[in-house]
């Protein structure tokens, strides 16, 4: 309420015509610190008092004391300071209203406030009573007022009030704890002179659920809160009445105690009386518990109870009591004849549950197809005779009826007449006749019309005949058989219903069958069967052998050999013999017994609930069978303890070591059966069945679940939401009551764990509805209890009501109302207040516009031919026994809709028309607008939208908008979706393989199609799986294949993938619109290499590589091995008895059927470990300045060795984890003389160690280039030989690129003008009295601008449209090359290639650029090559001429040396050469000559003439160039050149180098005598550890370390190719070294003598002599070359190298 209305309301309290003086305001007003308050006030004065200048309104605080001015309408300055800005006069003196507003209240504001008004000096009035204001720090709690008695179904008001009111901010009262669906609140505020207050009223419809509810009223003011509460006591009739049945959760058996308890969930006041009813009849019991001491058939029925209190009563839902028992009734009751109908009925007491399942047994054998309570034997036959009983079963157990006998009378069947002969002498015959009949028949046995025996006593009295009889059985024994005893014997059977006869042809001369060595043999033993007969042996005699009555073999032999008898050979054998004239009778059967060890046992476990009758409880059955002969000893073990054996025992349970009396053991041959009554927890788990006899043993295992753990839910499995549920895990175990932990599972997922056997759900919520199970954790292997379903009941939630509009089918709407409730709710749909349909049935005719369909908690109403009158509010109400709720929506019928022709369901490419329809007639000029997925379609403005061939991208939601001319409103249609179907596309087939223990293969096929496609997965031509039938194929499904199907997805899992599963799989996808397919190769990795003892072994160890194959046909496979990609041998495994480093390589095996490509395994690498060897220690010195020395130690070791480097006994460095394996590097920066000396390196690994040492000498002489090492061409350069240790006189010798340049006393070389010829490597030697010292080479670089640019081109003869353009230049530093055409850059050497379209591959080298050009035009093209570096640039132009010619070689381009060769330049296309034509030839781009003839002839081609040739034809019409061709001249190897190098100090290392010249390349071999030492072919010779071979084209080098005596001798180097061969030989050994030493000693002696003579010649002659001696000494110390007829030996000093002439060999190292 606004402030002004409140003032007007306040002014209304002043009556008109008031004639007295006075002020009215509340007695007291309350406020809270920080808030505000209003003091309502009105005043009055006589009507005759004149008001000349208005009325002055004044409010005072503490009027009788301090009299502080609070508000002054005339002079605000008089207001007390503490009230300024916090008070506001809200009244209007003219209307005699004097309200005062106090803001930002403080506790100090408490006190009396008085109002005074002044009209004139005479007329003024003060209120002496005033208003008491109270301001507190905290608000007082609100006051709640409620009715005295609350009764269910009544409506009451609860009032909450507070004295606090503030106009500036809201003072809020709020009710809490009420049910919003059944309550409403409203508030009011009081501003009157009589008082101020705020009231909040709660109006509620009382329900029994409100009993005990706490209502709270909360006050919010000035950031403070306070609340009051009230507890409701609602009287109501009893609620939640139901009957609890005990026992529950299982079947109630006859004789058991049954208790029915009437439970009342809530009642206020308490229940006063209980009534019981059975089948609607009232019982005498008036207590809350009904006891049935011994349940009987008559106790079954429907029970209810009624609870009553002072308010009302309630009847419980009915509960059915069923006594779980059965009995069988047979009809007819008398004798039963064949072809009569017999009916057996399995009767149960009343109120039998509907979920009963019936089973029928005949002679204790289950009848598979009989599962109803009635068993009918139509046209009964003799086979129906037997004992019958029925079994009723539900989820809690089963119960069997007593057996009844059914006997079907019938006449005798055909008798069975058999004959036997005595097996040894054949003098006794036995005939046996048996028959089946009911009642028993009389049997008569006769021969030739003469009765020999009968069951009635008539028989032949001859002593040779003796007969015995039994029920339906007759036996006749004939002694001293005679020929007359042969013939036809007849057996007749007769009873009251008929008779039957059979005959037998008996032969007294029947054959006999003998078994050798015995009738009982062991499997695998040889057995001979012999057939003896009385027939004379003749050549045409034939013997027939029969096994179990079937012909087995026929032949001339009287013996049948079984070379290795098996269990399948066991059985009954007989034989026949015949010749050309007669035949013997069949022999008597002889039984062959084959003994064999136990096969795999069959072990099954089962649990029967109440299988043996009422109260029997649970019965566990463990059954173990085995196939063996002799019968096996069976033994059942549980947790390594023998439970039962098949051994005979003296009685009791001694065989199981003191078993429980609950356990019953049944034994039979090859069978062991154990029954456990009420199994305990300790008896659950894994059982092992072992079978053994004298020939072997076998075993198998199975898990037994005795349901020792049972989950019970109390009070019931079905509860109301908000009640309490107790879940108890009952465990039957030996240690009952001992502490245990329990695991709880909800819907199969672990839910909780703890020591409590009972879990309480309080309150029960609907989300608690689930399958619950439990398990005890104390016992290992304990089984889960049987899951129990908890159902939760709750009233309906608020329904969900939706409306769907279908504009394509006659303007139809579909209303769908769904709700969540349990039990199911009754749904009702209203239009306004008109009921349209309910879930019980439609309220309108279903054949009209309305069509209703109801499902569980769902109601659908279809409204056809919508009209504008169908718009409005629709309401759906849901009701069940627990409550009700409703919801509503407003439905608007649109003025327009979209019609689709032919249908919204379309195929891709189909024509479709969309029409925009409206309810009323369409006026002319109506405009239309179409939208797809909410976006306007600009191209269509007519009433129809057409698609000649719709595509997938055009699918979507379409709607239209129609607007009549001159109308401001539009008709908007609801969207309608177009669904476009299409054929399968984008088929993908993915294969994965997991090589873990399960070897799981996965094939996943996906496709994009609509409608979803049918997927078929084929392996070759075999169907493996499909989306229709899962795993399938002609041979049936395999248990290894698991199929998962989803829309457009087919997943195949192959468990235990094998070799046969590999190959190409095809996935075919098809729907009604088309098909597509994809294929993939599946690799099951079924072939693997197994290495024993492992993939990492030590050198010299035994290694075995086995090819493992997962396959079903291992015997039909062949094996192939590959070592480093090379095929090795065919075997299942490869033994390596003494593995070496050469074996450390990659291995793989291939497996496949003969004649087919093998399936290869994945390669596995064999890692061979060996001790450290080939330890090398080297050093390098920096070439410039010698400021860095590098010491490098390397070793060959596996595993990598630990390297340590030391100098003078001091460790300098060692390898770490971050070091390069088998390498140790030491850098000495600024080395000093003290760093010289011997360095040692040691290599150590777990397999061994090695050591080596090296002397380090620092370099003292170096070459200095001034001003720098790189100078421009033409600049001066000085090369200085710096030797700090030189002493005059010093002789300096200079070398350029390894060649001697000059020598003299000058230490420098000066070049005034540097040219490119000066570039290269410079080194020097300094020689003085101390000796000779050499420097390392220093490189001089002369820089110059690019020059000699050459642009050449040719066309590729292999591809007519491709040409090659090459640009080369000479420059230093290298130039940057660019190739352009028509001003566009095609390629550069800096890496920017293919800048223009049409360019091809680019090759870049130093100062060279090569470009392949594709699609070359027919005409000539001009190309520009530009070269540029820092010193300048150059460019050249070349033309890519049209290839109009081709070089033709006769006989070819590969020609033997000395043969004749003609190269012809042939023109392409057009006429041949004419007059004035010239042909120029080029060899390696060098012009040879020009001739008028197109042929270049070679009479005897030589190897020097090999190279590149092309021709240029200059014709009158223009020039034509050919592409170059390569000419190869072939020649046999010349005599090889063989060089031998021996280390001069000790001769411990040597090198043999053999080279040859040949074309094609030759194959080189090196022999020592007859031993092949090395070859240029791969794996040509087994290399020894100390011999290293290096092969290159036409060259073979052999390094021999630690030279042995066996390595010395005459070596022969042979070279051969297809044209011939050549060889040479030389001696290699220390013999040449000894000769060299002797020669050196001789040189020293001669040199000394010559030196003494030359001293006499003077200083000049001495100088000349000294030079010659130095050179000779250098040669003697460092290099001596001895040339013999067949050997060349060169020794080198590793610390120095010299060259006398340009022809000396370069130093090695």
Swiss-Prot record:
Intervals, Extracellular compartment: 20-1641
Pfam families per record: C2-set_2, I-set, Ig_2, V-set
Domain (Ig-like V-type): residue spans on this chain: 20-136
Leader sequence segment: 1-19
Ligand binding (N-acetylneuraminate): 63, 116, 122-126
GO biological process, one term: cell-matrix adhesion
Residue ranges annotated as Cytoplasmic topological domain: 1663-1709
Residues the record marks as carrying a glycan: 159, 265, 339, 499, 697, 726, 730, 741, 886, 1104, 1138, 1251, 1462, 1476
Entry comment describing in which tissues the protein is expressed: Expressed by macrophages in various tissues. High levels are found in spleen, lymph node, perivascular macrophages in brain and lower levels in bone marrow, liver Kupffer cells and lamina propria of colon and lung. Also expressed by inflammatory macrophages in rheumatoid arthritis.
Subunit description: Interacts with TYROBP. Interacts with CLEC10A.
Official protein name in the record: Sialoadhesin
Gene from which this protein is expressed: SIGLEC1
């Amino acid at each position: 309420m606004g402030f002004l209305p409140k003032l007007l309301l306040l002014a209304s309290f002043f009556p008109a015509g008031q004639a007295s003086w006075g002020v009215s305001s509340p007695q007291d007003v309350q406020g809270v610190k920080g808030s505000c308050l209003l003091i309502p006030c009105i005043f009055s004065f006589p009507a005759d008092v004149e008001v000349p200048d208005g009325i002055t309104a004044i409010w005072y605080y503490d009027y009788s004391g301090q009299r502080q001015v609070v508000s002054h309408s005339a002079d605000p300055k008089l207001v007390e300071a503490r009230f300024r800005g916090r008070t506001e006069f809200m009244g209007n003196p003219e209307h005699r209203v004097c309200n005062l507003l106090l803001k930002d209240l403080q506790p100090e504001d408490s006190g009396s406030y008085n109002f005074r008004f002044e009209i004139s000096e005479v007329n003024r009035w003060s209120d002496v009573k005033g208003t008491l204001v109270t301001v507190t720090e905290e608000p007082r709690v609100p006051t709640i007022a409620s009715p005295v008695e609350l009764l269910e179904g009544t409506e009451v008001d609860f009032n909450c009030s507070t004295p606090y009111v503030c106009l500036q901010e809201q003072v809020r009262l709020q009710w809490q704890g009420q049910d919003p669906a059944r309550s409403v609140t409203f508030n009011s505020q009081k501003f009157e002179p009589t008082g101020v207050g705020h009231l909040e009223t709660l109006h509620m419809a009382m329900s029994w659920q409100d009993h005990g509810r706490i209502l709270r009223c909360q006050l919010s003011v000035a950031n403070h809160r306070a609340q009051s509460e009230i507890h409701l006591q609602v009287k109501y009739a009893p609620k939640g009445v139901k009957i609890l049945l005990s026992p529950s959760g299982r079947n109630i058996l006859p004789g058991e105690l049954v208790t029915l308890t009437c439970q009342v969930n809530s009642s206020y006041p308490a229940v006063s009386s209980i009534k019981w009813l059975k089948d609607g009849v009232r019982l005498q019991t008036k207590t809350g518990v009904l006891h049935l001491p011994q349940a009987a058939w008559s106790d079954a029925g429907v029970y209810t109870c009624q609870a009553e209190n002072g308010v009302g009563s309630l009847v419980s839902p009915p509960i059915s009591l069923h006594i779980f028992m059965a009995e069988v009734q047979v009809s007819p009751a008398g004798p039963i004849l064949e072809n009569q109908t017999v009916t057996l009925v399995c009767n149960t007491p009343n109120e039998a549950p509907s979920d009963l399942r019936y089973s029928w047994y005949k002679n204790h054998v289950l009848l598979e197809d009989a599962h109803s309570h009635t068993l009918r034997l139509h046209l009964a036959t003799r086979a129906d005779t037997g004992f019958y009983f029925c079994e009723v079963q539900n989820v809690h157990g089963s119960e069997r009826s007593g057996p009844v006998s059914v006997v079907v009378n019938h006449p005798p069947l055909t008798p069975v007449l058999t004959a036997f002969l005595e097996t040894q002498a054949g003098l006794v015959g036995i005939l046996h006749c048996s028959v089946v009949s009911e009642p028993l028949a009389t049997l008569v046995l006769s021969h030739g019309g003469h009765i020999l025996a009968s069951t009635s006593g008539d028989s032949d009295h001859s002593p040779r005949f003796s007969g015995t009889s039994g029920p339906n059985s007759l036996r006749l024994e004939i002694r001293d058989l005679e020929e007359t005893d042969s013939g036809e014997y007849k057996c007749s059977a007769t009873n009251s219903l008929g008779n039957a006869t059979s005959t037998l042809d008996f032969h007294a001369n029947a054959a006999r069958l003998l078994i050798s060595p015995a009738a009982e043999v062991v499997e695998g033993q040889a057995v001979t069967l012999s057939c003896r007969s009385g027939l004379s042996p003749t050549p045409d005699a034939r013997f027939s052998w029969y096994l179990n009555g079937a012909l087995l073999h026929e032949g001339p032999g009287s013996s049948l050999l079984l070379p290795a008898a098996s269990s399948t050979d066991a059985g009954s054998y007989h034989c026949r013999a015949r010749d050309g004239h007669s035949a013997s009778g069949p022999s008597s059967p002889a039984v062959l017994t084959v003994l064999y060890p136990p096969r795999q046992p069959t072990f099954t476990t089962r649990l029967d609930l109440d299988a043996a009758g009422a109260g029997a409880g649970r019965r566990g059955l463990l059954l173990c069978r085995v196939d063996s002969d002799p019968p096996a000893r069976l033994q059942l073990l549980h947790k390594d303890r023998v439970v039962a054996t098949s051994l005979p025992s003296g009685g009791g349970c001694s065989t199981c070591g003191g078993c429980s009396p609950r356990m019953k053991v049944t034994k039979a041959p090859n069978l062991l059966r154990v029954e456990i009554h009420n199994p305990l927890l300790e008896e659950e788990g894994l059982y092992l069945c072992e079978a053994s006899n004298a020939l072997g043993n076998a075993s198998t295992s199975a898990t037994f679940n005795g349901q020792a753990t049972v989950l019970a839910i109390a009070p019931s499995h079905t509860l109301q939401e908000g009640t309490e549920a107790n879940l108890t895990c009952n465990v039957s175990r030996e240690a009952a009551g001992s502490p245990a932990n329990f695991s709880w599972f909800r819907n199969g997922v672990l839910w909780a764990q703890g020591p409590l056997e009972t879990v309480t759900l309080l309150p029960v919520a609907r989300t608690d509805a689930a399958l619950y199970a439990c398990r005890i954790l104390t016992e290992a292997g304990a089984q889960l209890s049987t899951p129990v379903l908890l159902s939760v009941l709750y009233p309906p939630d608020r329904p969900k009501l939706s409306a769907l509009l279908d504009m394509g089918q006659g303007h139809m709407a579909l209303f769908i109302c769904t709700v969540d409730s349990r039990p199911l709710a009754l749904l009702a749909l209203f239009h306004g207040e008109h009921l349209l349909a309910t879930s019980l049935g439609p309220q309108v005719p279903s054949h009209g516009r309305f069509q209703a369909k109801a499902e569980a908690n769902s109601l659908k109403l279809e409204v056809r031919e919508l009209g504008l009158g169908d718009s409005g509010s629709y309401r759906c109400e849901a009701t069940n026994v627990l409550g009700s709720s409703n919801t509503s929506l407003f439905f608007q019928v649109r003025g327009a809709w979209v019609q689709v022709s032919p249908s919204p369901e379309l195929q891709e490419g189909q024509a479709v028309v969309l029409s925009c329809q409206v309810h009323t007639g369409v006026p002319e000029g109506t405009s239309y607008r179409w939208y797809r997925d909410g976006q306007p379609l600009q191209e269509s403005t007519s009433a129809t939208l057409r698609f000649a061939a719709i595509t997938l991208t055009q699918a979507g939601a379409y709607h239209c908008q129609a607007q009549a001319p001159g109308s401001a409103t539009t008709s908007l249609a609801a969207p309608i979706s177009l669904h476009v179907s299409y054929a399968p596309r984008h088929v993908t087939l993915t294969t994965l393989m997991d090589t873990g223990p399960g070897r799981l293969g996965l094939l996943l096929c996906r496709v994009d199609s609509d409608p979803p496609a049918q997927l078929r997965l084929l392996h070759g031509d075999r169907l493996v799986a499909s989306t229709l039938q899962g795993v399938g194929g002609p041979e049936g499904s395999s248990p290894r294949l698991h199929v998962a199907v989803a829309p457009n997805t087919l997943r195949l899992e192959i468990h235990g993938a094998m070799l046969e599963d590999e190959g190409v799989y095809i996935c075919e996808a098809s729907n009604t619109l088309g098909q597509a397919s994809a294929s993939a190769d599946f690799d099951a990795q079924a072939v693997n290499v197994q290495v024993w003892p492992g993939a990492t072994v030590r050198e010299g160890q035994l290694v075995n590589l086995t090819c493992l194959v997962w396959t079903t046909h291992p015997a039909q496979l062949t094996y192939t091995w590959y070592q480093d990609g090379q095929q090795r041998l065919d075997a299942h495994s490869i033994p390596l008895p003494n593995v070496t480093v050469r074996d450390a390589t990659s291995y793989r095996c291939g497996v496949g059927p003969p004649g087919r490509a093998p399936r290869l395994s994945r390669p596995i690498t064999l890692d061979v470990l060996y001790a450290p060897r080939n330890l090398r220690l080297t050093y390098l010195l920096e070439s410039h300045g010698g400021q860095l020395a590098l010491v490098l130690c390397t070793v060959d070791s596996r595993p990598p060795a630990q390297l340590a480097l030391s100098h003078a006994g001091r460790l300098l460095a060692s390898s770490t984890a971050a070091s390069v394996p088998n390498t140790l590097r030491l850098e000495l920066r600024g080395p000093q003389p003290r760093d010289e000396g011997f360095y040692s390196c040691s290599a150590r690994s777990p397999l061994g160690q090695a050591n080596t040492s090296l002397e380090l000498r620092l370099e003292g002489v170096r070459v200095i280039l001034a001003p720098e090492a790189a100078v421009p061409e033409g600049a001066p350069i000085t090369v200085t030989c710096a030797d700090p240790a030189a002493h005059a006189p010093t002789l300096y010798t200079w070398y350029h690129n390894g060649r001697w340049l000059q020598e003299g006393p000058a230490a420098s070389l000066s070049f005034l003008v540097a040219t490119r010829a000066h570039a290269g490597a410079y080194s020097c030697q300094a020689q003085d009295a101390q000796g000779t010292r050499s420097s390392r080479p220093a490189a001089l670089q002369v820089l110059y601008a690019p020059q000699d640019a050459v642009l050449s081109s040719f066309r590729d003869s292999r591809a007519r449209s491709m040409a090659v353009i090459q640009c080369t230049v000479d420059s230093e530093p290298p130039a940057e090359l660019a190739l352009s055409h028509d001003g566009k850059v095609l390629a550069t050497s800096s890496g920017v290639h293919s800048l223009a379209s049409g360019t091809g591959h680019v090759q870049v080298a130093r100062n060279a650029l090569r470009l392949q050009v594709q699609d070359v035009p027919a005409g000539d093209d001009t190309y520009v090559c530009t070269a540029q570096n820092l010193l300048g640039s150059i460019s050249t132009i070349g033309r890519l001429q049209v290839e109009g010619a081709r070089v033709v070689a006769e006989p070819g381009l590969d020609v033997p040396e000395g043969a004749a060769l003609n190269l012809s330049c042939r023109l392409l296309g057009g006429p041949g050469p004419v007059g004035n034509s010239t042909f120029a030839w080029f060899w390696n781009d060098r012009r040879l000559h020009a001739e008028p003839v197109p042929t270049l002839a070679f009479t005897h081609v030589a190897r020097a003439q090999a190279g590149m040739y092309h021709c240029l034809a200059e014709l009158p019409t223009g020039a034509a160039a050919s592409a170059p061709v390569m000419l190869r001249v072939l020649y046999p190897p010349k005599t090889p050149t063989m060089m031998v190098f021996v280390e001069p100090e000790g001769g411990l290392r040597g090198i043999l180098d053999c080279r040859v010249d040949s074309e094609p390349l030759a194959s080189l071999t090196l022999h020592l005598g007859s031993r092949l030492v090395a070859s240029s072919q791969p794996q040509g010779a087994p290399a020894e550890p100390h011999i290293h071979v290096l092969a290159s084209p036409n060259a073979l080098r052999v390094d021999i370390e630690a030279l042995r005596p066996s390595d010395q001798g005459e070596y022969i180097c042979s070279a051969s190719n297809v044209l011939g061969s050549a060889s040479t030989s030389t001696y290699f050994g220390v013999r040449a070294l000894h000769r060299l030493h002797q020669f050196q000693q001789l040189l020293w002696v001669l040199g000394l003598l010559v030196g003494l003579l030359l001293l006499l010649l003077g200083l000049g002659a001495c100088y000349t002599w000294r030079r010659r001696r130095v050179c000779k000494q250098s040669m003697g110390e460092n290099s001596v070359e001895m040339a013999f007829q067949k050997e060349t030996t060169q020794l080198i000093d590793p610390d120095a190298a010299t060259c006398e002439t340009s022809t000396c060999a370069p130093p090695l190292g």
